[in-house]
């Protein structure tokens, strides 16, 4: 599979998993299982990007908003390592969060994991951002979702 597709799948998988959280909100085991599966799939895509990366920086332009402003993705060694780190940590933090949320009998699990998944999708986008505009598009959702995560049990 071309690396360009893997980049999009690495970003879209956590976002889709976040949406599935809302669909399966009544069944806790299914909801948590789908989210954990999404974390594993995201890590799988990140590993495939790492294995398919030949060491040469590559630029992929998704769309041109106006001349000089593009949504583009850039594959380079540091971004690939960052995506591997973030996706592997998502698996561990997800397992911890399930235990914590259930053990503390917190409410709003689906909402928490929705924002958590969107946050990871944004982090994956940041790791492959090709310019400042794309970085800005993915950084803003990270700031909003990270602001919401600590307050989720109270909302």
Language-model features: locations:
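Alpha-helical transmembrane segments and their immediate interhelical/interface regions
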Residues: 1-16, 133-144
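Transmembrane helix-loop-helix hairpins at membrane boundaries of multipass inner-membrane proteins
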Residues: 1-6, 16, 20-114
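Short conserved micro-motifs on helix faces and helix-strand junctions that flank
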Residues: 11, 73-74, 87, 128, ...
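Anionic group-transfer/hydrolysis microenvironments
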Residues: 78, 142, 150
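Single conserved hydrophobic/aromatic residue that forms the stacking wall/gate
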Residues: 146-155
């Amino acid at each position: 599979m071309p690396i360009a597709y893997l980049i999009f799948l690495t970003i879209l998988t956590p976002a889709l998993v976040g949406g599935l959280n809302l669909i399966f909100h009544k069944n806790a085991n299914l909801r948590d299982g789908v989210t954990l599966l999404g974390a594993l799939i995201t890590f799988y895509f990140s590993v495939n990007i790492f294995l398919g990366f030949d060491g040469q920086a590559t630029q992929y332009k998704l769309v041109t908003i106006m001349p000089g402003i593009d949504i583009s993705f850039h594959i380079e060694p540091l971004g690939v390592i960052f995506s591997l780190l973030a996706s592997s940590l998502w698996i561990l933090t997800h397992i911890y969060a399930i235990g914590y949320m259930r053990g503390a009998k917190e409410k709003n699990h689906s909402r928490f994991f929705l924002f958590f998944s969107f946050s990871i999708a944004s982090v994956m986008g940041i790791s492959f951002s090709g310019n400042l505009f794309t970085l800005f598009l993915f950084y803003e959702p990270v700031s909003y979702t990270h602001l919401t995560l600590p307050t989720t049990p109270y909302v």
